[in-house]
């Protein structure tokens, strides 16, 4: 606790890290960050997995950036490109900004308004909930090519994020086992004056 009875930032970070991240032992006597931290591929992969794919919440954008129906904004969660969109029902959804077919980037603009998201590569089309709605040449051309007979569009939507709205700040997580945003932030939520809007 710091002056005023609240929790200080350092205390919050210690609690958050101890609750949500694996222990990393620091060598005794080391007072500088080793250069290896910035160039080690294995460490970078671990960081991506723990900080961005693990049970953590990451800031995505402001709700004010997508005020209208069909508005979208693009950002990244770690190295993963994501889309945050307001669907026709007014709900806010988040999903990976890569086509499930061949991994091509879907939205190349940082912001916009659209009713659907189309892949420029093979024209697979998604709605603003991340559902696959159309596959061009699903049956092939003149009996050649196409998708297998048992192909179901409903099973090939974009990878989604859980979304939390705290006073217009939109956070997302890929992890289904992540705690609620309130549990994740703990006492820091009150210290920041954040309440849950959705």
Predicted features and spans:
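Glycine-rich active-site/cofactor-binding loop and its immediate structural neighborhood
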Residues: 71-120
